[in-house]
């Protein structure tokens, strides 16, 4: 092997080793950031949980049940549900958001900053939370599969959630039933995996959103989808209802 070739080989080994070294550092940094945000009951020190109290579902349930909507962190410091309070909370480890505010008729705090990226179930989350009407358009719901009755009887809710990634959602039964003021376009929703949408807009008196492009080819249950949706006059002639087995009312 001549000197020139040897030099090329050594140069390659050096560059490869250096690249591997930096990749290893980056991996460990990212791993450290992720682990940091998994420490329930502690204050995050970096990443998306930085400065926030890392909470569990049970922490939320306890704070809701006593009506304080506040979780006590280290040093007896209060961390509020609403953004901009005495301290924010980090919800990125919670999978189950179902029924959190069910029946909380006066709840209307700004929780748009919550991290919902791990959520899989949001059924009944705001069921009968009649006053709730906050901007939650930035929520990451890409892993959610169930949204049944999510806004059932949430009579004041009328926020733009057209940007939600609902591509993994399978069940949206009664999602907006009796959500009297809801009237937003949902034309960007990918409902291709939805199989159940019975009563979804039942009693949604103001709803006249554009849903003409929905892919309903996998939906089996269409029962009473628009019963009582007095304002709805959109064209849904192109809906594929070939999988429908229940289409009463």
List the predicted regions and their residue ranges.
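N-terminal secretory signal peptides that target proteins for export/translocation
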Residues: 1-15
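A cross-taxon signal for low-complexity, glycine/charged-rich
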Residues: 4, 22-25
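Negatively charged
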Residues: 22, 29-249
């Amino acid at each position: 092997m001549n000197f020139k070739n040897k030099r090329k080989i050594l140069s390659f080994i050096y560059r490869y080793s250096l690249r591997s070294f930096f990749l290893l550092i980056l991996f460990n940094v990212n791993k450290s950031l992720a682990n940091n945000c998994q420490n329930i009951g502690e204050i995050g020190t970096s990443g998306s949980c930085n400065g926030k109290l890392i909470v569990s579902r049970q922490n939320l349930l306890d704070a809701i049940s006593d009506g304080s909507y506040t979780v006590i962190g280290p040093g007896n410091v209060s961390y509020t549900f609403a953004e901009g309070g005495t301290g924010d909370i980090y919800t990125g480890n919670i999978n189950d958001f179902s029924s959190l505010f069910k029946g909380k008729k006066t709840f209307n705090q700004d929780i748009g900053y919550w991290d919902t990226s791990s959520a899989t179930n949001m059924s009944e989350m705001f069921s009968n939370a009649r006053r709730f009407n906050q901007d939650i358009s930035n929520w990451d719901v890409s892993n959610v599969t169930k949204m049944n009755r999510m806004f059932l009887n949430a009579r004041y809710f009328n926020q733009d959630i057209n940007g939600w990634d609902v591509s993994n959602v399978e069940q949206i039964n009664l999602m907006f039933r009796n959500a009297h003021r809801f009237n937003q376009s949902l034309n960007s929703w990918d409902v291709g995996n939805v199989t159940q949408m019975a009563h979804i807009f039942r009693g949604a008196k103001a709803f006249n959103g554009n849903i003409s492009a929905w892919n309903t080819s996998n939906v089996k249950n269409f029962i009473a989808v628009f019963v009582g949706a007095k304002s709805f006059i959109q064209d849904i002639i192109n809906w594929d209802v070939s999988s429908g087995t229940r289409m009463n009312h």
